[in-house]
Amino acid sequence: KMGKKFFCCDAVLDTASRQIEIHSGWAKEMQPIAWKTADRRTYVHWAEKKYDIVVFGMPTNFHYGDGMGTNTIQMMQALSAQVIRHKRILSDHCVFIVSSICDGWFHEERWPYLRELYELFQHDSMNILPDMNRYGEYFATKEEYIRKYRFANAFHPFHGFSMMSCGHLAEEHTSAIYIVGAREPGIARGMGLKTRATFEEALEDAKRKFTGPAPNILALPRTFTTTAVHLCMKDPGENSHYRDGAPAHPCGG
């Protein structure tokens, strides 16, 4: 405990990152007020049915920077972020179909450790991303990666383990993820992703193997281009504690 009160300003932003509400004061009293508006913006009670297939695109530059949508460790984090945001409206056999150039550019100036992490995941009995955990301290203390973090504007090497920790959720909570249009499809398959040349091919394969012939399909064309919302069922009673992981969640579950 610091023993002092801190004066803070807290702005609530909309989907276009514009300020829609500003509060000032002691953080302990002021921030819960700001969270009420932020929750109304973020948790959108919209869906009247669960979706079997979700379709969206993955730009090259978003979230953590340029290259986010071209190397598969960062891509897995982004895919898992979609699970976190929308799991309340996903069916239990949901499939993602995602466009990405996935060309193997790791942007090593920004993430100098990612290629080594990816290559290590392909060997040494690494079956799922959590198996990589035992190498966390090794990467986090590797001198050259630390030097690039300190002096060359790179991310800290342990950041890659944060990405993989989140990235495992995509495998856990979807039946399959298809990457469409990959220029280096092998690196996508190396992370457990399926690859197809077109959306039509991916959709037909998903219907045949996972969803049946008449899936509920949700297209999200603005994914990763605006500030995300968390889609919820229109009826708050359908947003379960199990899906939210919190008993008093603003989505109503």
Explain the meaning of each model-derived region.
Residues 52-57, 97, 218-219:
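Structural motif
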Residues 1-52, 57-60, 77-90:
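Conserved, well-structured core segments that form the ligand-binding/active-site neighborhood
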Residues 14, 59-62, 102-105, 184-185, ...:
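Short, glycine-/Ser/Thr-/acidic-enriched flexible segments
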Residues 73-178:
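C-terminal catalytic subdomain
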Residues 2-3, 58, 62, 90, ...:
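Structural signal for hydrophobic packing residues in well-ordered secondary-structure cores
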Residues 3-6, 49-52, 91-95, 123, ...:
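Short coil/turn connectors at secondary-structure junctions
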Residues 21-22, 64-73, 106-119, 192, ...:
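Short glycine/threonine-rich loop-to-helix capping motif typified by GTGT followed
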Residues 165-245, 250-251:
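Extended hydrophobic packing segments that form well-structured cores
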